[in-house]
Amino acid sequence: MIKNSFISVIPQEEKEENKGSVEFQVFSFTNKIRRLTSHLELHKKDFLSQRGLRKILGKRQRLLTYLLKKNRVRYKKLIGQLDIREPKIH
């Protein structure tokens, strides 16, 4: 698998400064999710990776919910940049 094929939305300078920002964390989780998804397409019975994927999806969802409550503009921009579907909010 090619690691460089993943998206680079956040410029390199910002990555060095802002590793704790919500946007960077969501970006990082999204790359991990895409990597695990492609892995699971080849290895359908890798249940530990499936569990890890579900945990990462939950973490990303909680961060996105937090960002939605705090700053809707940044949320919409991030969703658009990362090409993530907007979840149903209960």
Curated annotation (Swiss-Prot):
Subcellular location per the Swiss-Prot or TrEMBL entry: Plastid, Chloroplast
GO molecular function: structural constituent of ribosome
Keyword list, A-Z: Chloroplast, Plastid, Ribonucleoprotein, Ribosomal protein
GO terms for cellular component: chloroplast; ribonucleoprotein complex; ribosome
Biological process terms in GO annotation: translation
One protein family per Pfam: Ribosomal_S15
Domain of life, per lineage: Eukaryota
Sequence similarity: Belongs to the universal ribosomal protein uS15 family.
Quaternary organization: Part of the 30S ribosomal subunit.
Stored NCBIfam families: S15_bact (TIGR00952)
Name listed for the protein in its UniProt record: Small ribosomal subunit protein uS15c
Organism (species): Dioscorea elephantipes (Elephant's foot yam)
Gene: rps15
